Amino acid sequence: MRRIKHAAATALLAPGALVAQSAVPRYEVARATAPIAVDGELDDAAWSAAAPAVTLQFLWDEQTGAKQRTRVRLLWDDQALYVAYDAEDADITAQYTQRDDPTYRDDALEIFVNPDPRQEAVYYGFEVNARGVLYDYLNYNSRTLFKRFDATGVEIATALRGTLNARQDTDEGWTLELAIPWANFEELSRRPPVAGAVWKANLNRWDGVEPDRRMSIWSDPLESTAWPHVPGRFGELVFVD
């Protein structure tokens, strides 16, 4: 079962253990060296210059869905933040078809972005299902205040290695490629990042159909159940040239 951390237990830890427990991951977002065609194939030369992909981790053992690997890479340039997901999936499913449908109930890949870490509780959410349908919002308190937000100019492409909503066969997986123009972050950050800037983010995946459904995630939110909306536990994106 997913570990639940109790404050009373910290006295039993070695001096360095608490620091290690609370650390968040860091990813260096390289500048794209060539144009990126957002087609879901992830075969542009620019992706070869990205830092090695992060692999999302499984933290909640009470979930019964299959543990299917997800790897994520990121790049940036003067126009946008680029995100590439590669998700193993033996049964690709997605029912929702309209913008701002609850895509998180489908097979979905997500990125949460906070461009101003001084405002720890605020972040943008981009959640895309295997059909390429986007649910986006601006969250102000990490629990209940999800503000309607419609990003503009976002490029989205998925590529399926299998068939959608066909449970009788076995699929291999799917990829998602995103380009999010910097203008979409202006409410929290008036200018694009520069080399050396640090933003906060988390990368998540919802996979499977209830009751066999599982979440995987980049940065551990230290929650006893699968809840990714903990901006104080987001990992760090460091923009580099």
Question: How would you describe each model-predicted region?
Answer:
Residues M1-A11:
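Bacterial N-terminal signal peptides that target proteins for export
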Residues Q21-D241:
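Structural preference for beta-rich elements and adjacent junctions enriched in aromatics
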